[in-house]
Amino acid sequence: MRLNIFIMVDIHRIVSGNVNCYIVADNDKAILIDTGRKKYREKILEKCKDFHVSLIVLTHGHMDHCQNAAYLASALQIPIAMSEKDMNMIPDNRKQSLSAKTFLGKIVLSVSLSSFEKDSLEMFEPTIYLNNGDDLSGYGIDAKIVELPGHTKGSIGVKIEDNLFVGDALMNMFYPTISMLYTDEREMLKSAKYISELGEISIYFGHGKPKRNRKWVK
């Protein structure tokens, strides 16, 4: 699925259950943002083969976003990039505790914690540790990394033109909202406020369809 409003790069949303991965392409280069769950790895790999994907960017360390990172990196022979602040989650997603306040958030939290108990991640070592302001143009896409802590300590966004890929810093599972789950509520709200202040951009969520930016917090 593409959202073609205010877009010059090609953005391809790969729906993998309730999780999104994105291929962002510009001419003959592309990056993959998040990798989805194991169940969907072949679907995602086949889509990647339609492009010259040169880099995997993980928005954070939760397994629904990075369970296929090792597999896809090996299959495509490309590096993985993420924040070092989430590396403690790769062997065990329970290493960063999560909280929720809303009724729906508590349901999502319960499902997530059950998944953390039952599922596992194939270990991987990122080639690149990302920090705020890092430039990905060396991989063919004019993208900047934006730190968006709160959902996890190492949550990041990827800003490309007037588009921001936010991972789970914001969510659109049931409706567009701030993150329903967070490691640090104060940091999560600060990140949501920062996104609000970016103005007229398109938001690409880790869960749900893209939306135009809005005021996420007062």
Task: For every predicted segment, state its role.
Residues 2-51, 157-169:
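Conserved beta-strand hairpin/beta-sheet module of binuclear metal-dependent hydrolase folds
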Residues 24, 34, 44, 60, ...:
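Divalent metal-coordination and catalytic microenvironments
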Residues 31-33, 57, 80, 165, ...:
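Residue-level marker for buried hydrophobic side chains located in beta-strands
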Residues 37-38, 84-88, 170-171:
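Short, acidic/turn-prone active-site loops that include or flank metal/cofactor-
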Residues 52-75, 132, 146, 181, ...:
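Soluble, non-transmembrane catalytic domains of enzymes that act on hydrophobic metabolites at membranes
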